[in-house]
């Protein structure tokens, strides 16, 4: 049929990293059940301001 596409998200409530299948209907945190999860950002090098 189709391959499982699992992506890593971060829960907005408990802060844990969760691997979710995006084809699954309710996208929820597997630890606390919260519905809002976000994709983690890549680390960005900081630019220091000149003084």
Swiss-Prot record:
Designated name of the protein: DNA-directed RNA polymerase subunit Rpo12
An MF annotation (GO) of this entry: DNA-directed RNA polymerase activity
Gene that encodes the chain: rpo12
EC number assigned by the record: 2.7.7.6
SMART domains: RPOLCX
GO biological process, one term: DNA-templated transcription
Keyword Disulfide bond: no
Cofactor annotation remark: Binds 1 zinc ion.
Species per Swiss-Prot/TrEMBL record: Methanopyrus kandleri (strain AV19 / DSM 6324 / JCM 9639 / NBRC 100938)
Record's subunit section: Part of the RNA polymerase complex.
UniProt keyword list: Cytoplasm, DNA-directed RNA polymerase, Metal-binding, Nucleotidyltransferase, Transcription, Transferase, Zinc
Catalysed reactions, semicolon-separated: RNA(n) + a ribonucleoside 5'-triphosphate = RNA(n+1) + diphosphate
Residues binding Zn(2+), per UniProt: 14, 29, 32
A single GO cellular-component term on record: DNA-directed RNA polymerase complex
Transmembrane regions listed in the UniProt entry: none
HAMAP family xrefs: RNApol_arch_Rpo12
Family: Belongs to the archaeal Rpo12/eukaryotic RPC10 RNA polymerase subunit family.
Role, per record: DNA-dependent RNA polymerase (RNAP) catalyzes the transcription of DNA into RNA using the four ribonucleoside triphosphates as substrates.
First-listed, main subcellular location of the protein, grouped into a coarse class: cytoplasm
Name of one Pfam family that matches: Zn_ribbon_RPAB4
InterPro entries: RNAP_P/RPABC4 (IPR006591), RPABC4/Spt4 (IPR029040), Rpo12 (IPR023464)
Coiled-coil region list: none
């Amino acid at each position: 049929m189709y391959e499982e596409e699992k992506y890593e998200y971060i829960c907005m409530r408990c802060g844990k990293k969760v691997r979710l299948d995006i084809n699954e209907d309710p996208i929820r945190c597997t630890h606390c059940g919260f519905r809002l999860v976000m994709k983690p950002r890549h680390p960005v090098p900081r630019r220091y301001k000149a003084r």
